[in-house]
Amino acid sequence: MARYTNSLKIFTGNSNPKLASEIAEHLGLKLADSEVGTFSDGEISVRIGESVRGASVFVIQSTCAPVNNNLMELLIMIDAFKRASAAEINAVIPYYGYARQDRKAKARDPITAKLVADLITAAGAHRVVTMDLHAPQIQGYFNIPVDHLLGGPILAKYFMDKELGDDVVVVSPDHGSVTRARYFAEKLNAPLAIIDKRRPKANVAEVMNIIGDVKGKKAILVDDLIDTAGTLVQAAEALLDHGAVEIYACATHGVLSGPAIERLKESPIKEVVITDTIPLPEEKKIDKIKVRSVAPLFAEAILRIHEGMSVSKLFT
C-alpha cells in the first residue's frame, strides 16, 4: 500500500460520503481533506484542504438527488483540482444522473446525458469511472476514457448464495434490459423471460405480455435502476398472474423516488436487492430492501487505474 499513498488521493462531495469512506478504507487510505458547503446565497463552496500538486486524484460523487447540487459540486471540485495542478483527475460517478435523457425521444428534446458529459470534460476531468449506465452508449459521449463497471456480478452473487433452487427464472422487465438479464440468467444457470409492454391504442392501459415460461417458478426481475417502482410492481403482478410463485427484484441503482417505498411495501415482491451507489436514507429502509456494497469493486478499479493495470480483467 505504501508505494502509492503519497500520489493517490480520494476525495468526496456530499452525495455519498459513506461509500467514499469505505472505498478509501479498502485502499488503506483516509479520505483527503476537503470541505464542500454553500455560501449564504446558495452558491456551492469548495475548499481543498491539502496539496494535490502532481497527485492522482479520484473524486467520488454520485449525481443522485439533489441531482443539480451534486453535479455542480462535482464540476467545481474538478475545477479546483485542475487549478491546483493535480496530475490526473478521475471523476468516480457510481450513479450517473441524467442518463435516461440519452436521445431525442420526441421533437425538440435535449440530450442532457451528452451535455453532462461535456460539462465534466470541460471542467477538467481526465477519466470517468461509473457503473451500469442506463444507456451504455453514453460512454461514447465522452472524449476521455470511461471505465464502465458492472453491478451484475454483485447482485447475481447474492442470489447464488441464497440458493433458491432449480425453479428460477430471470425476467427482463422490458426489451432494454435484456442484455443485463441474459448475463444474470447465465450466472444463475436459469432460463430467461421478457416482459413485452404494449399499449393496444391511445388512452388504453398497457398490456404486459410475458415471453417465456414463469409458471411455478421463482422469478427474479433484473433492471439497472428502480425509480418510482411503478413498472416494477406492475411487472411483479403480471408474473403472479402468469403463475410465478415468488417474486424477487434487483437493480444496481436504488433511486427510489416519490411513492417507490410505499409501492414496494405493498407489492408482492419478496425482496428488493440494490447496491449502495446511491445512499439509502433511514426513512427508506424497509425489511424488503437489501443493500450490497460496491466499495470493494470501486476500490479495486481505482487501484488498477492508478497502477496502469487492466480494469476489464475484473469482469473476465
Curated annotation (Swiss-Prot):
<keyword id="KW-0545">Nucleotide biosynthesis</keyword>
<dbReference type="InterPro" id="IPR000836">
    <property type="entry name" value="PRibTrfase_dom"/>
</dbReference>
<dbReference type="GO" id="GO:0006015">
    <property type="term" value="P:5-phosphoribose 1-diphosphate biosynthetic process"/>
</dbReference>
<comment type="pathway">
    <text>Metabolic intermediate biosynthesis; 5-phospho-alpha-D-ribose 1-diphosphate biosynthesis; 5-phospho-alpha-D-ribose 1-diphosphate from D-ribose 5-phosphate (route I): step 1/1.</text>
</comment>
<comment type="subunit">
    <text>Homohexamer.</text>
</comment>
<dbReference type="InterPro" id="IPR005946">
    <property type="entry name" value="Rib-P_diPkinase"/>
</dbReference>
<dbReference type="InterPro" id="IPR029099">
    <property type="entry name" value="Pribosyltran_N"/>
</dbReference>
<dbReference type="GO" id="GO:0002189">
    <property type="term" value="C:ribose phosphate diphosphokinase complex"/>
</dbReference>
<keyword id="KW-0418">Kinase</keyword>
<keyword id="KW-0547">Nucleotide-binding</keyword>
<keyword id="KW-0808">Transferase</keyword>
<comment type="function">
    <text>Involved in the biosynthesis of the central metabolite phospho-alpha-D-ribosyl-1-pyrophosphate (PRPP) via the transfer of pyrophosphoryl group from ATP to 1-hydroxyl of ribose-5-phosphate (Rib-5-P).</text>
</comment>
<keyword id="KW-0460">Magnesium</keyword>
<feature type="active site">
    <location>
        <position position="197"/>
    </location>
</feature>
<keyword id="KW-0479">Metal-binding</keyword>
<feature type="binding site">
    <location>
        <position position="199"/>
    </location>
    <ligand>
        <name>D-ribose 5-phosphate</name>
    </ligand>
</feature>
<feature type="binding site">
    <location>
        <position position="134"/>
    </location>
    <ligand>
        <name>Mg(2+) 1</name>
    </ligand>
</feature>
<dbReference type="GO" id="GO:0006164">
    <property type="term" value="P:purine nucleotide biosynthetic process"/>
</dbReference>
<dbReference type="InterPro" id="IPR037515">
    <property type="entry name" value="Rib-P_diPkinase_bac"/>
</dbReference>
<keyword id="KW-0067">ATP-binding</keyword>
<dbReference type="GO" id="GO:0005524">
    <property type="term" value="F:ATP binding"/>
</dbReference>
<feature type="binding site">
    <location>
        <begin position="100"/>
        <end position="101"/>
    </location>
    <ligand>
        <name>ATP</name>
    </ligand>
</feature>
<feature type="binding site">
    <location>
        <begin position="41"/>
        <end position="43"/>
    </location>
    <ligand>
        <name>ATP</name>
    </ligand>
</feature>
<protein>
    <recommendedName>
        <fullName>Ribose-phosphate pyrophosphokinase</fullName>
        <ecNumber>2.7.6.1</ecNumber>
    </recommendedName>
</protein>
<dbReference type="Pfam" id="PF14572">
    <property type="entry name" value="Pribosyl_synth"/>
</dbReference>
<dbReference type="GO" id="GO:0004749">
    <property type="term" value="F:ribose phosphate diphosphokinase activity"/>
</dbReference>
<feature type="binding site">
    <location>
        <position position="223"/>
    </location>
    <ligand>
        <name>D-ribose 5-phosphate</name>
    </ligand>
</feature>
<dbReference type="GO" id="GO:0005737">
    <property type="term" value="C:cytoplasm"/>
</dbReference>
<feature type="binding site">
    <location>
        <begin position="227"/>
        <end position="231"/>
    </location>
    <ligand>
        <name>D-ribose 5-phosphate</name>
    </ligand>
</feature>
<dbReference type="GO" id="GO:0009156">
    <property type="term" value="P:ribonucleoside monophosphate biosynthetic process"/>
</dbReference>
<dbReference type="InterPro" id="IPR000842">
    <property type="entry name" value="PRib_PP_synth_CS"/>
</dbReference>
<dbReference type="GO" id="GO:0016301">
    <property type="term" value="F:kinase activity"/>
</dbReference>
<dbReference type="Pfam" id="PF13793">
    <property type="entry name" value="Pribosyltran_N"/>
</dbReference>
<comment type="similarity">
    <text>Belongs to the ribose-phosphate pyrophosphokinase family. Class I subfamily.</text>
</comment>
<dbReference type="GO" id="GO:0000287">
    <property type="term" value="F:magnesium ion binding"/>
</dbReference>
<feature type="binding site">
    <location>
        <position position="174"/>
    </location>
    <ligand>
        <name>Mg(2+) 2</name>
    </ligand>
</feature>
<dbReference type="InterPro" id="IPR029057">
    <property type="entry name" value="PRTase-like"/>
</dbReference>
<keyword id="KW-0963">Cytoplasm</keyword>
